[in-house]
């Protein structure tokens, strides 16, 4: 083990005991607040095109960077899985609409596949009419069920040809191609879609796609690639917003925003100024990286200071963080009609008191250490702990930091245990109860929260984790070619929250929990019978036709023998 890693490990071991001692939960954090959400509050669930649709090469769709990434070799995705079929959502629209109605949601957040609409990524070259028809039919089906579509333009599945020709988001020309794609979507669907999201979690898209290489396109341009990609994504967002504002807003009366994911960063020791600064730095490098240019016109000052200083220490003449011109700052500032927030968990943050020897990177630029409390409930994914109070703090931070914007929670949820096939997900119920209640407290604090999207409708392809992490309200049996869906206990619980528009009283809320667990036992029996049903299906589809063919053959032989005897 290298000396620097020994020092890191010892430092973290010394910090862990401080977590419980330095911070004690306030009565306000521990208490449950019974009450309802404002009238008109919108409840929903979400998904994304690449994770659920399948049909990766059907009806004129072009390849995406994720198609190529998952097809190009072993070790990139757990189990070497692909999303070629995924949930088969392309062919199961009506079935999934029934699930949405069963949940009683007000809205459904989904993404459009850029390469399904524009196979080469460039509008001037080719528009896929079948792609237009597919999404148009989906939108109509939602509206006919009184479900509002909230549409994401880009959720990570960039057309592969744009990556090959131009280097993807490393090239500023992507901003114009994205604007053209956005205009196509506004033109085709804007008469019915009134809530648009330009990008979903662009921070992860930039960091994992252009720094760590864990996501498509798999580039490892450490310390530079992610900042350049983010710079161009922010410009692309602004161009799409201005196009809508100039050309479409007066006709369509819709809203355009962006969805940014961020965990809450809590200082290990609130009496230590260094920890307070580190926690603030964590939030600015996470949320402020994209939100600050959109709401204030430029990157957070702490990002410019830290990356600039480290770039100089590394012998570079210019900062690795790109610079916006004065004209660009003015153009980008104010380009959001609402702030979309995604949030899953919390980290304790402390300053890093030792030098990093790993070279330039996003992680090293921040000069901080992330920790978790060993007492926090550990959920399915290794990174995901249930810490509801962090949600309220993030919502209040965003509210004050960015000038009281309308906020839509666009992602919040918990993953299933690894390869778990149980439908009694009571731990997810506890997660939902805690996090939604903290959101209610944030509204009580004064946060202008308009809606909540739980992640996600279905179990689906989870990027480099394949199908191992299950976030869905509905369990999907991926080993069955029909991809059947089964409701988990959390379906019943979330539905009750939606119908009641919150948590009316202790007795009623407790009854929801008991009812949810009762129904899941029946659903588990259905799921347990699935192997037998699959076997029966195999018998029906393979054995029976084979036997029939043999019967026909034997009959023909007997008939020939009979004819020979008669002759």
Curated annotation (Swiss-Prot):
GO terms for cellular component: brush border; endoplasmic reticulum membrane. Keywords: Endoplasmic reticulum, Glycoprotein, Membrane, Sensory transduction, Signal, Transmembrane, Transmembrane helix, Vision. Residues 23-541 are extracellular. InterPro entries: Glyco_hydro_1, Glyco_hydro_1_AS, Glyco_hydro_1_N_CS, Glycoside_hydrolase_SF. Glycans are attached at residues 80, 171, 245. The keyword Disulfide bond does not apply. Pfam families: Glyco_hydro_1 (PF00232). The keyword Glycoprotein applies. The chain crosses the membrane at residues 542-562. It is a single-pass membrane protein. One of its GO terms (molecular function) is hydrolase activity, hydrolyzing O-glycosyl compounds. Its main location: endoplasmic reticulum. GO terms for biological process: carbohydrate metabolic process; lens morphogenesis in camera-type eye; visual perception. Gene3D superfamilies: Glycosidases. Residues 563-567 are cytoplasmic. It is found in: Endoplasmic reticulum membrane. Residues 1-21 form the signal peptide. May form dimers. PANTHER family: GLYCOSYL HYDROLASE, LACTASE-LIKE PROTEIN. Plays a role in formation of the lens suture in the eye, which is important for normal optical properties of the lens. Belongs to the glycosyl hydrolase 1 family. Klotho subfamily. This is Lactase-like protein. It comes from Homo sapiens (Human).
């Amino acid at each position: 083990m290298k000396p620097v890693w020994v020092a890191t490990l010892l430092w973290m071991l010394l910090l862990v005991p401080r977590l419980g001692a330095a911070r004690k939960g306030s009565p306000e954090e521990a208490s449950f607040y019974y009450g309802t959400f404002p009238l008109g509050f919108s409840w929903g669930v979400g998904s994304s095109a690449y994770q659920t649709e399948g049909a990766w090469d059907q009806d004129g769709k072009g390849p995406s960077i994720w198609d190529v990434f998952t097809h190009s070799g072993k070790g990139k995705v757990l189990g070497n899985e692909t999303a070629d079929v995924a949930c088969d959502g392309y062919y199961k629209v009506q079935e999934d609409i029934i699930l949405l109605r069963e949940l009683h949601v007000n809205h459904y957040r989904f993404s459009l596949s850029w390469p399904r609409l524009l196979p080469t990524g460039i509008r001037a070259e080719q528009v896929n009419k079948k792609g237009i028809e597919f999404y148009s039919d989906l939108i109509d089906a939602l509206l006919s069920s009184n479900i509002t579509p909230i549409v994401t333009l880009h959720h990570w599945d960039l057309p592969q040809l744009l990556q090959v020709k131009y280097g993807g988001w490393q090239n500023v020309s992507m901003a114009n191609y994205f604007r053209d794609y956005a205009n196509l979507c506004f033109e085709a669907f804007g008469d019915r879609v009134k809530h648009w999201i330009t990008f979903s979690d662009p921070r992860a898209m930039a960091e994992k796609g252009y720094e760590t290489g864990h996501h498509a396109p798999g580039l490892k341009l450490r310390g530079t690639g992610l900042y350049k990609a983010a710079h161009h994504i922010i410009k692309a967002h602004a161009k799409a917003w201005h196009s809508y504002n100039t050309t479409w807003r007066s006709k369509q009366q819709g809203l355009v925003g962006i969805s940014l994911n961020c965990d809450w960063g809590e200082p290990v020791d609130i009496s230590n100024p260094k920890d307070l600064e580190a926690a603030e730095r964590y939030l600015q490098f996470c949320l402020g990286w994209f939100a600050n240019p959109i709401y204030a016109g430029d990157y957070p000052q702490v990002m410019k200071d830290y990356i600039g200083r480290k770039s100089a220490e590394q012998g570079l003449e210019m900062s690795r963080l790109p610079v916006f011109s004065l004209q660009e700052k003015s153009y980008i500032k104010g380009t959001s009609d609402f702030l979309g927030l995604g949030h899953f968990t919390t980290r304790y943050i402390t300053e890093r008191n030792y030098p990093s020897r790993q070279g330039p990177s996003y992680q090293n630029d921040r000069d901080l250490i992330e920790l978790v409390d060993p007492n926090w409930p550990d959920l399915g994914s290794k990174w995901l702990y249930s810490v509801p109070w962090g949600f309220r703090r993030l919502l209040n931070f965003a509210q004050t930091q960015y000038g009281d914007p309308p906020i839509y929670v666009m992602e919040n949820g918990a993953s299933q245990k690894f390869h778990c096939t149980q439908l009694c997900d009571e731990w997810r119920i506890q997660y939902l109860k805690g996090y939604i209640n903290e959101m209610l407290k944030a509204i009580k604090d004064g946060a202008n929260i308009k809606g909540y999207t739980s992640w996600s409708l279905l179990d689906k392809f989870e990027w480099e984790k394949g199908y191992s992490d299950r976030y869905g309200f509905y369990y999907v049996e991926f080993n069955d070619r029909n991809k059947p869906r089964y409701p988990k206990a959390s379906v019943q619980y979330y539905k009750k929250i939606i119908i009641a528009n919150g948590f009316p009283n202790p007795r009623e809320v407790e009854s929801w929990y008991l009812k949810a667990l009762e129904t899941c036992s029946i659903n588990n029996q259905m799921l347990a019978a699935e192997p037998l049903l699959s076997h029966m299906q195999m018998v029906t589809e393979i054995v029976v036709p084979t036997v029939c063919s043999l019967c026909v053959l034997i009959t023909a032989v007997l008939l020939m023998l009979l004819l020979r005897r008669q002759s």
